[in-house]
Amino acid sequence: MSEKLKVGILGATGMVGQRFISLLENHPWFEVVTVAASPRSAGKTYEEAVGGRWKMDTPMPEAVKKLVVMDIHEVEKVAATVDFVFSAVDMTKDEIKAIEEEYAKTETPVVSNNSAHRWTPDVPMVVPEINPEHFDVIEFQKKRLGTKRGFVAVKPNCSIQSYAPVLTAWKEFEPYEVVATTYQAISGAGKTFKDWPEMEHNIIPYIGGEEEKSEKEPLRLWGKIEDGVIVPATTPVITCQCVRVPVLNGHTAAVFVKFRKNPTKEQL
């Protein structure tokens, strides 16, 4: 790519926004040119806005330190500076849905880390190795939004990204029942041990909302586009327990699968 795409980060001062900035440092395709956050951060440099709340293991990239934070609600102004945005905003689901579609309607593609649009029927939730064909639904979404270029696309819940690709590879053996237990790091809650010391040497055996996501979202990944919307698959039946563990980064999953056509060890 001869010229990098100009990227904006919505919700740039939060932990997920910081992760985007860290991962995109020196990226061969993308350059972070705009950071946007709440009105209380707007007008400050990114370094000033984040202050002592930088939570990444690596230092804050020099390229973003002096970027002036823009008000996330000044949609037209933010959109005019970028080719597309990554969304990591921390709002209610209805607010997230609304503001992401506002950006899309300015002809700015939105790639969202949030769960708000994961069940919007014409919004693709994609793991490229599993369901790249779901990007085709974007054309129907554009018609609904009245856009030529703008759209919203989302990623699935982090807890399923380890085992959903494996289950996809085993579809020929017709899995019909899946029991999974996920052991999820505190970074998934936007925390570090510094601001959540209670998690040291501790386990929380239930994470509100995570079980439903882990049980339903794989079915959407395996769904099909019909009449301009994504219709989720109905099998396998997935049962999941989600446990918060005292680990800073990285999730683990223990997954048990029943097949209608039992594979051999070699086939697996």
Q: What residue spans do the PLM features occupy?
A:
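Charged docking surfaces used in two-component/phosphorelay signaling
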Residues: 187-268
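N-terminal Rossmann-like NAD(P) cofactor-binding subdomain of oxidoreductases
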Residues: 1-205, 237, 265
